[in-house]
UniProtKB/Swiss-Prot annotation:
One of its GO terms (molecular function) is tRNA(Ile)-lysidine synthase activity. ATP binds at residues 23-28. It holds the Pfam family TilS. Belongs to the tRNA(Ile)-lysidine synthase family. It is found in: Cytoplasm. It comes from Xanthomonas campestris pv. campestris (strain ATCC 33913 / DSM 3586 / NCPPB 528 / LMG 568 / P 25). This is tRNA(Ile)-lysidine synthase. GO terms for cellular component: cytoplasm. Its EC number is 6.3.4.19. Keywords: ATP-binding, Cytoplasm, Ligase, Nucleotide-binding, tRNA processing. It catalyses: cytidine(34) in tRNA(Ile2) + L-lysine + ATP = lysidine(34) in tRNA(Ile2) + AMP + diphosphate + H(+).
Amino acid sequence: MDVMQAAGLIPATPPAPVLVAYSGGMDSAVLLHALAATDGYREAGLRAVHVHHGLHADADAWALHCQQQCADLGIALQVVRVQVARDSGSGLEAAARAARHAAFAATLAAGEWLALAHHRDDQAETFLLRALRASGPDGLAAMRPQRPFGPGTLWRPLLGHARADLAAYAQAHAVRWIDDPSNTDPQHERNFLRTQVLPALQQRWPLAADALARSAQLCGDASTLLHDDDVNLLPTVCNSAGALELQPLRSHSPARRARLLRAWVAAAHAPPLPAQGVHALEREIATTQPDRQTCFAWQQTEIRRWRQQLYLLSARATWPAQWQAEWNGDSTLLLPDGAQLQLRGTPGLRFEQPLQVRARQGGERIVLPGRTHSHQLKHLLQQSDLPPWERTRLPLLWAGKTLLAAGDQIVSAKLDQWLRAHAARLQWRSAAPAN
């Protein structure tokens, strides 16, 4: 039994079909070799993927090396070429990682497990990086052994092994690999920790990497317990529409409120809420002014306050001020921000004459059912339960110079009579919010 299986880190029975992320480096080469040496993985459909970033002059040669090694092992390999955004603002290393993970998610089959070759030394480096960024328990948990990923599961079976264990395996089994010179460039934060900091720590404390990895595991345990509490508490501070209610939120401590805010955002599959967002929203929670309206925006997402509630929204395209369209009601009208306008009734129903649909300009007036005089649309909308950011996106229906409706929220006497006569109604579907 080899050193990998002896430690029980590669189960003899595969948990699912496995896709190995194979860079060609020593770590992934050892992982691929160890899995290929176990018949159960082959029978379950073991395969590999190599991401060609195109960032190094030898990238083509590395892809060819991976193809040759997989051919020798009898393992199917898929080479995926990606374009790395050099102007992403997050740095080339982060951009390459994002492109790589997107390629993994696109390649992974439903129910398949993506095996990554991260080991204990990698875990220690990640823990230090997160600590230097002032992370809490969630961040200090570093890399989890497994978690949901794309259509399958991300799996790190080697987290309990030291880099030295992998090197010993590679030597014992004559595993061939390639060396990426960028992995030793101290300009990269992780490489600096790997080549400068950890060796110094291990010279003074030989088990430093083990201790740091163990601390990450303990933080992971604490994070799991806190997450369970978040899941149980979140329904007590959310309303049926998914908005956060400020009053019950105020009953919790600032630390718990911060966790609930992040859990609320995560539950909507929105980008993680940054620290400055937590601080900004904490000020909102502390302010009890009933008519206060504010917005915090990040990564095409925004949180807005209205009527003692917080709403999580996806950023949407603005309406061109002069936008207009003709619509006879026989098909769905797609609006500039992704919303839809429909005439619901008997099949084939349409207006006798096409109506004009326009964006709000201000100053509009409308005659309501049962009234003989007109009202300012602005005042009617202020009295409604429609949030202010939705009011500005209402499509206005006109017949010449007569305002007939503002979405499906306010309908004129004339259009209301026509809809009743045809057993019909307007339906305005706002673009889906994040929550």
